Amino acid sequence: MPVLHNRISNDALKAKMLAESEPRTTISFYKYFHIADPKVTRAALYQLFTALNVFGRVYLAHEGMNAQISVPASNVETFRAQLYAFDPALEGLRLNIALDDDGKSFWVLRMKVRDRIVADGIDDPHFDASNVGEYLQAAEVNAMLDDPDALFIDMRNHYEYEVGHFENALEIPADTFREQLPKAVEMMQAHKDKKIVMYCTGGIRCEKASAWMKHNGFNKVWHIEGGIIEYARKAREQGLPVRFIGKNFVFDERMGERISDEIIAHCHQCGAPCDSHTNCKNDGCHLLFIQCPVCAEKYKGCCSEICCEESALPPEEQRRRRAGRENGNKIFNKSRGRLNTTLGIPEPTE
């Protein structure tokens, strides 16, 4: 029986990937389609991906598939062909190729079965996820940005919006996508006559969000096909102005893709212009925050003097201190709330 999980340590896998000489390509894709038995599908896909030396993160559910992966450059077309042939619903699926990429984004394959491919908290049996808003292409996005009747809604987390977003886009202040959905409806109630344009990194969140807005009585709803990644790629290919400002946060080792030269965020420790995310080097924290090179040296990659001191302790003492304490290894969620308490950043005003 084939092994459907990793047997090598994470550190060893990372070292092996970094030592590879063959270039890799970072790819993301998603598809809402019915999967009768996600566990059976996982077993088959795991073998397919492993045979092509694919690394990354893949989520499967009855509602579809969501993936961010790294593929050896020589295997990309074979991977595409085999993915398209795997299920008729995947034929011709758009694969988002990373914009700013050295391929060293993942070093292990993790494939999980979940209740949903994106956690939305929706339990309304009458909700139709297929009744989505209209797609917008790059040129149409730019036209909408110039339309005074259009409102752009960012369906990403605070730490993503903080380092980059479309011109004048509205942030939905929440720690998770499931919290954003009802807030988006509430915030837009007074703007039902407006054109609502929703966007996210690769399209998966804004597609479902557009269906949720329509379910709640909004009729003028659009979403950007392929999200920020596809928009930026097509705008560059077509010689259009790129109207996304700053950096596009991504959920892999890179933590961001440079879209424009502007740096719109600031170091969370000294306030200097900076949009480089990092995780606190203290294994008992791992807070995701923005840190400039000066503060990285001053605090040795940690988020505070306390973490700096703790990370310098002998490993056994660090483990003793972490025992019974909530581990901060929540890299990609609840960032704003955790920043408020850890770094002393004031709560946002309403």
Swiss-Prot record:
Keywords recorded for this protein, A-Z: Oxidoreductase, tRNA processing
Record-stated family: Belongs to the TrhO family.
Pfam families (UniProt xref): Rhodanese (PF00581), Rhodanese_C (PF12368), UPF0176_N (PF17773)
Organism of derivation: Shigella dysenteriae serotype 1 (strain Sd197)
Protein name, as recorded: tRNA uridine(34) hydroxylase
Rhodanese domain location: 146-240
InterPro entries: Rhodanese-like_dom (IPR001763), Rhodanese-like_dom_sf (IPR036873), Rhodanese_C (IPR022111), TrhO (IPR020936), TRHO_N (IPR040503)
EC number annotated for this UniProt entry: 1.14.-.-
Annotated GO MF terms: oxidoreductase activity, acting on paired donors, with incorporation or reduction of molecular oxygen
